[in-house]
């Protein structure tokens, strides 16, 4: 590549020093795209298609510069001209193509597939406004469209286009590609995003409301449109079918271009179904193969040998079940195929629990994936065992050979090199760079001789990252935080099973404790980040409580110097890259058995935070790796929780009556909080906790408070705390997504 200075002069007709940050960003965007364009596509005979409703890719400039090996040179050229790459990157808008862990995992995975030199593309939709932009106003979440698409972007319009048939009309798609360069190798893959030229943002009314019936104009406007009514559910089906029909046609076209006769399609393609949203790819592939003259039996056999399903949840609400009549209304041409798939299952298995179409005429997408795919994987060891022994036991009894575990991972290029360059460079200095390609080499930190020097440096790095976060929050939200406080952080989408409400009850405990004269050894800053689905009322209520507590504490001069609560507005990948390196206490407090894996826990661990968590998801594997003395575990285990559910034995009212719990829950509807908040919202959350509490907040609350208090006390022994930090960073290598993807390939995909 030519120098950046020459490129800027050629394209902007001025030097780097003379450019604004906006001009430099456009120049750098195109410079980076040009460098990526020079990489060859991976061209193995067999290709994985990772189909997902979400790809939470984050800003791409620095990430792509790192993978292309250009980051240090570009940073220096900018610096020599008096410019700062971080300030230039501020101009970039974060792509709004995902929401939570599902989408971030997909982004890490396509990065790792490329970096391992495997042939594989992500396939999804190009949402114009993503989920939504979160605005915190009047102590509540408000939603507005998240406009991220600009004329100059990472998207490259492809010449490919497909006809997608629906019941009453056909839509013509447009395909956009985003290059995914591998880390310091000569090849790349792509993220393929389908869209519609007819989509029209003018139909959006107030907030994120829009006409859900005008499919040609609304189809790719938003990720996860509100499905609390019939029209919203139908729109989800339109979206999902548009994604998989385009994906299936792309798969067949590319296989034919490589020489497939379609009878051998499984030699050319393997489809990884990421959660149940892309499940209709199975009947759609069967439809396309039979249309091309392949018999039904053979078409089913081909598709069964090329589709694999990743289960991401044991929450029944998230395992999609669509009314057959809705499918008949949207995609009637798929219904006979789905009915035939169900008929074959019924002919072989009498257990109603494994049928695809249930007695209420609902189509169970996960059931179709399991019967008509060759692999079913969970995403953490505990999660996979729960699937086999409980949630999907009826299927495991039929197909034990299909079930396997692939513990999730994260890309260290995004979450260490990019998010925490100070720590990354220090690890390079003392360990060398082997860990860039083999993350297990981080274990060498354990045997590094000068432990005192390492601890002193880790203290300095953490302090530096806290100041960086403080500046970020001041600039983006006008909030000032104390960089000398303990940073206690819970960042993830708002859901009752993730139990942000339990953390809020701890905040109440601490507030009342300080009011009673028990001053903590040092100030504590409790940081929350996450969005609540617009139709998820209780999740909105939890955000409201957190914001009310923030106001009550800030306005209390006896407490404010010692405790602060901050809800980070519009939490996204960019915010995470500031929050994670600055964190001391990583909150991973889901009800045991409910979190499939989690990946935030891995990012925090890698960046030197200690985990406060239940024995749930990947916390179990973190605990096994670091040892009980280097993690803070509380709460009931998954077996106990599952048993309580089966026997309907948990009564929140009994726990509410306890002396240690009642004052905390009552404080939600105290005069102080009601003065800051909405009575209806606060009373609804209060009643939910004492009368229902489906995710057993009060069951674990006392132990949570006890262990968290122990953690705060342990923090004051800096030497012992830093010993734990070193162990956590050293053992994080297992959670590299490169390791996860290598296992997917070895056990499932079998790519060259």
Regions found by a protein language model. Name each.
Residues 1-752:
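A conserved ligand/cofactor-binding region detector
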């Amino acid at each position: 590549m030519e120098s950046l200075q020459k490129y800027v002069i050629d394209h902007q007709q001025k030097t780097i020093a003379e450019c604004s940050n906006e001009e430099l960003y456009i120049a750098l965007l195109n410079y980076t795209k040009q460098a990526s364009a020079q990489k060859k596509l991976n061209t193995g005979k067999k290709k994985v298609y990772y189909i997902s409703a979400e790809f939470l890719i984050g800003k791409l400039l620095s990430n792509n510069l790192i993978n292309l090996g250009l980051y240090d040179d570009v940073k220096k050229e900018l610096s020599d001209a008096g410019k700062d790459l971080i300030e230039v990157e501020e101009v970039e808008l974060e792509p709004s193509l995902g929401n939570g862990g599902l989408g971030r995992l997909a982004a890490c995975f396509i990065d790792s597939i490329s970096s391992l030199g495997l042939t594989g593309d992500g396939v999804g939709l190009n949402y114009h406004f993503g989920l939504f932009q979160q605005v915190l106003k009047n102590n509540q979440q408000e939603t507005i469209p998240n406009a991220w698409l600009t004329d100059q972007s990472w998207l490259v319009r492809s010449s490919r286009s497909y006809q997608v048939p629906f019941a009453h009309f056909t839509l013509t798609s447009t395909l956009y590609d985003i290059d995914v360069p591998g880390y310091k190798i000569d090849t790349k893959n792509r993220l393929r995003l389908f869209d519609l030229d007819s989509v029209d943002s003018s139909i959006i009314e107030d907030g994120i409301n829009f006409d859900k019936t005008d499919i040609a104009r609304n189809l790719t406007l938003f990720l996860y449109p509100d499905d609390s009514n019939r029209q919203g559910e139908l729109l989800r089906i339109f979206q999902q079918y548009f994604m998989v029909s385009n994906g299936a046609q792309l798969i067949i076209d590319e296989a034919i271009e490589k020489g497939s006769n379609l009878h051998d399609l499984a030699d050319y393609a393997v489809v990884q179904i990421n959660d149940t949203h892309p499940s209709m790819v199975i009947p759609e592939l069967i439809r396309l193969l039979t249309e091309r003259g392949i018999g039904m039996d053979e078409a089913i056999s081909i598709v069964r040998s090329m589709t694999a399903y990743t289960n991401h949840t044991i929450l029944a609400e998230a395992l999609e079940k669509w009314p057959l009549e809705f499918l008949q209304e949207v995609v009637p041409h798929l219904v006979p195929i789905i009915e035939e798939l169900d008929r074959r299952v019924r002919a072989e298995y009498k257990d109603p629990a494994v049928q695809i179409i249930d007695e209420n005429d609902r189509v169970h997408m996960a059931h179709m994936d399991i019967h008509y795919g060759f692999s079913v994987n969970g995403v953490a060891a505990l999660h996979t065992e729960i699937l086999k022994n409980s949630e999907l036991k009826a299927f495991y009894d039929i197909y034990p050979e299909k079930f396997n575990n692939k513990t999730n991972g994260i890309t260290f290029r995004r979450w260490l090199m990019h998010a925490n360059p100070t720590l990354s460079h220090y690890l390079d200095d003392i360990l060398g760079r082997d860990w860039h390609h083999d993350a297990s080499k981080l274990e060498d930190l354990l045997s590094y001789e000068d432990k005192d020097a390492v601890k002193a440096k880790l203290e300095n790095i953490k302090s530096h990252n806290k100041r960086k976060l403080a500046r970020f929050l001041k600039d983006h939200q006008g909030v000032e935080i104390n960089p000398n406080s303990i940073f206690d952080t819970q960042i993830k989408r708002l859901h009752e099973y993730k139990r942000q409400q339990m953390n809020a009850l701890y905040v109440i405990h601490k507030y009342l404790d300080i009011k009673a004269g028990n001053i903590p050894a040092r100030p504590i800053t409790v940081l929350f980040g996450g969005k609540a689905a617009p139709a998820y009322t209780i999740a909105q209520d939890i955000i409201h409580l957190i914001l009310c507590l923030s106001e009550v504490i800030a306005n209390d001069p006896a407490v404010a110097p010692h405790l602060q609560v901050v809800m980070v507005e519009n939490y996204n990948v960019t915010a995470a890259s500031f929050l994670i390196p600055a964190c001391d206490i990583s909150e991973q407090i889901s009800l045991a058995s409910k979190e499939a894996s989690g990946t935030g826990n891995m990012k925090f661990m890698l960046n030197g935070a200690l985990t406060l968590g239940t024995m749930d998801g990947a916390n179990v594997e973190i605990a096994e790796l670091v040892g009980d003395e280097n993690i803070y575990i509380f709460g009931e285990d998954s077996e106990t929780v599952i048993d309580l559910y089966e026997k309907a034995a948990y009564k929140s009212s009994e726990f509410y009556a306890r002396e240690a719990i009642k004052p905390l829950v009552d404080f939600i509807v105290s005069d102080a909080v009601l003065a800051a908040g909405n009575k209806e919202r606060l009373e609804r959350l209060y009643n939910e906790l004492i009368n229902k509490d489906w995710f057993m907040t009060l069951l674990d609350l006392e132990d949570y408070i006890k262990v968290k208090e122990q953690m705060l006390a342990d923090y004051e022994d800096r030497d012992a705390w830093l010993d734990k930090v070193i162990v956590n960073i050293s053992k994080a290598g297992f959670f590299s997504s490169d390791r996860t993807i290598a296992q997917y390939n070895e056990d499932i995909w079998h790519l060259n």
